[in-house]
């Protein structure tokens, strides 16, 4: 190379930099100097046989800045594009470098300003450069660009080739998910995202997840098929060819073992539920599928998610590039998506079954929907709508069942009250809703238990109630049950609401108008609402007390079902009243009303009076004197005559009577008429002034303030103290004595006739429980029976009789005294029976007894055949205790005839009066000579006793009886004159058989003696009275006597 020729300049340093950077003039000058010194150029390399790549390699030997994707190009440690960057991002170093970044920002600004200055210099130098240099630089630049293009092309091609690999399906030889455990407890099942995902990405991942899941299931099947063992083989056989119940049980076991890989069995159960062939099969599969969802498939704390609700934009980041981890997530998410669709399909099937024609099918579907709603949050909105819709079912059983299930739901989940009320409100305002459905919905709402923290819900309910109240008034449907249910709901929701008084005042006048035309139960609800509204405002009006005073005389009080509520309302009203005169009038009328009521209501009213007297002691002045209203007072007029004038105690005093008589003489008739007492009506003008004074009691007054109740006494208590019911008499006497009634039970339930009859038959009454699994008991007062431990005992039990009489309730003293006497009698009878010794019969005695019946003549004539009393003969050696029997007879005499059973009666019970008795079989003259029978054994008919019952003939009694009193027995009454049966003697004259004994037979057809004898023997054989039968009985008896006997029963 000649010295005057300049070498070609080439910038090999950082060829990938931008154009403006590579054209730096300072660098060019430096490079030119270096190349000039070294004599190294591209042309030199080409001349020596090298290539362009050789030149680039040699030119970059001393450069340390040429790095491609984290490593030197062409070396072994060359990294893929972006791999180092992703690794650094995973280290999360960015959060630690915030302060460093802030410090580097001003330096970057300085560098940027320097670069701008350099660019200006470059532009100036370009103008001064020679044309040769420009041409050489352009060539070098063209070569460098050509060098850069082939390097950048493989990177972009690698990115394009790598993107389809994300959704590529790779088959594996092993399962990714291990069997066992709940699927929702696995590691990746709780990952979700609320952000919307790109639809195209979701569809691609879903297709990949489907392939992965199908491949996973196929691996599971091949694994189970290759298993060898008795249990697996038996399970396969049952699932394929067993009965319906066995198949479902086997499928449940398989699903419980591994739910993810056995989704096909879940689909099989779903198809059995949808099958329309057999109702029994459908219901069986329904219960099975429901239990499977509750116990194994559905999570407790969350709903199932669809496939698009998962974070696919972070999937690669969460899996850290691990395809196994990513595929596990995709399989679980796809399984959850499929399961959610199956559950939604099951809910639709429940909706279809709930409209079935059979009551059983509808009930089972309703119960299944309720259990899923209570236990799991999945599809709760659809299930709630189903249960609420059944409130309008045409059959009352289904509607009441739905109401009960909703109450159970609110007890388990109190936070759902607002949601349930909202759904019921939508049901009530439907256009095609039936009145019965509205009634059931209102009844459910008024049974809802509220609290003071739920004032908004109470306000909403009151607004709803008043809306339907106005509708009922417009329709003039005041006699319906709907109005009573609405008022009940308002009464229960008003204490918890914060609604304005204006809304309630709008309905007060309407309530007063409705009060007098509806039935008694509805009027009680209206009065309760009026009292709550007025009491909350401390403005209880006279109009309210007048309406309540009038309602006490309503005939419906006797038969209504809200007597307790009415008495409670009276008690609250009287306790809040400050007018003592009005309280006296209410107490007086209440005692008057009790005269026509049953004992339970009377006891409740007396208890109310006792509590009022305790709260207002000034009322005790009414108890000072107790004149009897039926008697009359004798008052002297003061005339010379001795005549007496009769005046009523309530109509006036003695001085008033004298004045009235004197006025008749002096004043004219017109003034006398003006003096007559007038019946008090509403509040008169004179009463307001205080000028009119009422001196007598007017029971027919409409206003309790001006009825004159303070001028009379509570004489009704005197009559009630003589009531036939012991509890009523006790309560009345307690009040008259000035004491308070101590009773903590419910008199309206404790003193009913049904409770008395339950105790009479030794059965404890049913406990009045509230609705099970509900909070309805919150609305009822606490029930504490007075002397509860005594009332729980049976009246004939030993524990009951062991109590003292003072510890027994008054209404059960009758049982106590009765069974006390019976227990004493039974105890003495047992003692006397134990003291009696029963002797065994010897063989000789039995032989003598048999000989009396065995005779050569089958028809033995004689008087002994008909001598019934001959059997009651005197025996020797018998043990008898006559004194004990006589003493027991005296103690039995204390009991009434109705209280003693026939088994405990003796001679004195059979004595005949002058007019005769029930057991009079002989004449009065001969009754004294009747034999005295022994006391009957109370256990004569038991298995252990050797005696027979009184109805059977006692053979052994003829030989071992007790000592009897020596009384002659005249048997003349057993025979009659021969004229009465003389015609029988005439007809049977000349026959050789008995015609006058107890075995006599008539022979009107003149049958032969042999014929009659054969018939007699046949009759004896049929009735086991022949000789062979008697001998057989004798042998059996001897065997029985030779057998070892049981020891005698010990005395108690």
From Swiss-Prot:
Residues 122-150, 644-677 have a biased composition (Basic and acidic residues). Residues 23-34, 627-643, 883-932 have a biased composition (Acidic residues). Ubiquitous. Residues 1-40, 122-158, 621-677, 876-969, 1032-1052 are annotated as: Disordered. InterPro entries: ARM-type_fold, CCAAT-binding_factor, CEBPZ/Mak21-like. Keywords: Activator, Nucleus, Phosphoprotein, Transcription, Transcription regulation. It comes from the Eukaryota. The modification Phosphoserine is found at residues 629, 641, 837, 958, 972, 977. It is found in: Nucleus. Its main location: nucleus. Transmembrane segments: none annotated. One of its GO terms (cellular component) is CCAAT-binding factor complex. Stimulates transcription from the HSP70 promoter. Belongs to the CBF/MAK21 family. This is CCAAT/enhancer-binding protein zeta. It comes from Mus musculus (Mouse). The lineage of its organism: Eukaryota, Metazoa, Chordata, Craniata, Vertebrata.
